[in-house]
Amino acid sequence: MTYRSGLTPILLLLVSCIPCIAGKPNIVFFFIDDLGWTDVGFMGSKYYETPHVDKLASEGTIFHSAYANAPNCAPSRACLMSGQYTPRHGIYTVGDPRRGNHTLRKLEPTENKTVLADGFTTIAESLGSNGYTCATMGKWHLGKDPPTQGFHVNIAGREWGSPSGGGYH
């Protein structure tokens, strides 16, 4: 299967936590933006072939009643990382909510933060304090660098979201 960064708006944030202490389970968590609930084989897709994801699903835990806390990537990710709803962390959208032609705007945009404040304890910080080494791979959009939020390994995540240079290559 070949992926091109412009082909689909899917965002992949993979958090892989490897235990440092024997007896703790490995945790591999996929947080994917714009993935429809039937866009993978194990959920019934007849169009997309996802054999590796299907295998992981058959051996792991699937959250069937989960929902996104926000309509797009950065606020959803901030909710997941902090355990807080959008009004608490203040990240409502990606970037400046006042973008676009202001004469066409029907509502005044809410003040928006673009960085998850250091005062929030992230899931990576909580796992790290319990003996896990945490990694993030993919889009970040929550501040300058994921290691400032508890991640020990960061591949491709920066404040602008995706890696510089235009893709995940």
Which residues fall in each region the model found?
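Bacterial N-terminal signal peptides
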Residues: P9-C17
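Formylglycine-dependent sulfatase
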Residues: I21-H169
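Bacterial N-terminal signal peptides that target proteins for export
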Residues: M1-I10
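C-terminal multi-pass transmembrane helix bundles with aromatic-rich, positive-inside signatures
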Residues: T2, P19-C20
